[in-house]
Amino acid sequence: MKILIYMDSEKYHHPPVMMGKIIAKATDGEINVLVVVPKGGHPENGEAVAEQVKLDLEGYSPKVFVKQGKSREIIKEELDREEYQLVIADTDRINRFKKSIEVDPMFIKQSAISLLLTQQTKPRINKILLCTGCKEDDYSLINQASALAGDLGAAVTLLHVFPGAVPSMYTGLEQIEETVDEMLQTDTPFAQYLRRGVEILKENNIASEVKIRRGIPIEEIVRETQVENYDLVVIGSSMVDKGLLEMLLGNLAVKIINRIELPVLVIGTRTLA
């Protein structure tokens, strides 16, 4: 896996570097680090961040680049130069990015590259919350998450949230949380998708469970992270409309970042390998 860690020169953020180490170690990945100095900024600050990165990534042989200019242009140039599978950035940086850069849908047209936004990063990833929209016949999200979980040695909870009221096909079930087994035995597209998802996880020797909720998706995702001790939340790029920049700025991703004090991985279409 080829990983790009995105840093800025204003302040050294350790979580992206820590997460880069965790994933690179598990996947035998290659790490590049891009330190961006804004126009009018001090290049020596960027060099100081770069030196700290090299110390923290000792043993991983990272390539560290310090560049000055507009963040958007520098990131695009680097992503055009190399075929990365994963970009890691800190949420503090994303919030500043959101305030300072107008969304340009043509900036990055595809949603191929996975994006990992770090906060409250733990030294190990043991438990992953995988949020699925149950897209019929599309198991790419589960396949990608399963492969990563296998490399990390992590367990996976597969969560699906029915927006609003419980679907009419399940009317009469008093507590949807308590009837997962019953729902999985039906022939509905949701049940078929989740059953296949569990099979994929089992095929990869991943310890797993399925949880089903009803309500506002973001609220149910937040609630789940509050009652269980997860280390990483995973969503699909289909939850965001346009490319990597939209992953950074898209409404759902921003809501999740703002509400969940955990690293969030948005999985793109390019294989994490």
Regions found by a protein language model. Give the residues of each.
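Small/aliphatic-rich secondary-structure junction motif
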Residues: M1-N45, E58, K127-T179, I200-K202, ...
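A short acidic, glycine-rich active-site loop
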Residues: E178-P189
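Charged docking surfaces used in two-component/phosphorelay signaling
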Residues: V66-I74, R213-E219
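General small-molecule cofactor/ligand-binding pocket signal
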Residues: N32-L34, K63-K67, L116, T157-L159, ...
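Short, hinge-like loop/turn segments at secondary-structure boundaries
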Residues: V49-E51, C134, E174-E177, V227-E228, ...
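Short, surface-exposed alpha-helical segments at coil->helix boundaries
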Residues: V17, P43-E51, D187, A191-R195
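A short, acidic, amphipathic alpha-helical segment used as a generic capping/interface helix at domain edges
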Residues: Y193-V198, G215-Q226
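Gly/Ser-rich helix-loop-strand patches that form or flank binding pockets
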Residues: K76-R124, R223-A273
